[in-house]
UniProtKB/Swiss-Prot annotation:
It comes from Blochmanniella pennsylvanica (strain BPEN). This is Ribosomal RNA small subunit methyltransferase A. InterPro entries: KsgA/Erm (IPR001737), rRNA_Ade_diMease-like_C (IPR023165), rRNA_Ade_Mease_Trfase_CS (IPR020596), rRNA_Ade_methylase_Trfase_N (IPR020598), rRNA_adenine_dimethylase (IPR011530), SAM-dependent_MTases_sf (IPR029063). The gene is rsmA. Specifically dimethylates two adjacent adenosines (A1518 and A1519) in the loop of a conserved hairpin near the 3'-end of 16S rRNA in the 30S particle. May play a critical role in biogenesis of 30S subunits. It is an enzyme of class 2 (transferase). GO terms for cellular component: cytosol. The lineage of its organism: Bacteria, Pseudomonadati, Pseudomonadota, Gammaproteobacteria, Enterobacterales.
Amino acid sequence: MKKIYYKNHLIKKKWSQVFLKDQNVIDTIVKTINPKKHQKILEIGPGLGALTKQILNIADLDSLILIERDSNLVNRLVQMFNKKINILHQDIMTTNFFDLSHKVGQKLRLIGNLPYNIATELIVYLFQYTNVIYDMHFMFQKEVATRLYANPNKKEYGRLSIITQYHCKVVPLLTIPATSFFPIPKVESMVMRLLPHTNTPYPIVNIGKLSSLTKLAFRQRRKTLRNSLSTFFNETEITQKGINPALRAENITINQYCTLANMLNNK
């Protein structure tokens, strides 16, 4: 397999490494994030520091926290930014954000161009830390991004839409052409803002029940609820909650799923 380099860095395909190179796009993203000097900003997967450099220039931060697992990139970043960054050489999926927030004494603002291969898994992982996250600005593959903010009755609407919107207000901000990256990916990307709810609009007793329920419902999404959820409920129970059991998983609102999750928790 042919080796590909970007600015003398050997790109690791196994980690889905792509590098943002369009300065106009970089400027627009950072202006949209609007970083402030007093804020604690953490960048996930900074790569070669395209966003890092611009954020430090715009916000004049005392320190920017970076999490990077690629040791070659860690060394490059240290050389580039020296004392302006606090870089953590570790896997983001093992990072304890409660500890990080406690150390800096405030909620964190998270940013990053997320690797395509872990974007969905990472977002779900971060939801356990929403109490210590102020907001998140991430670049996603467009297909993933549209699933995050999809509404019922749309083909993109699914379990990820429900879990994401349960935890956060989701705002699509920018569409980024594939040519803004190297290597050029096959799809466009989108910058999304995820703002954790301070008061959830979806009251629920046990989030685990919502997770189990939606996993079952969307496993065979073309089945009607009377069939897909028969493990948990009979048809009468679904009807008693004002939900038509002849509907399919993609027709059910988040509020309705929360109602069913609460009923399941009481069983």
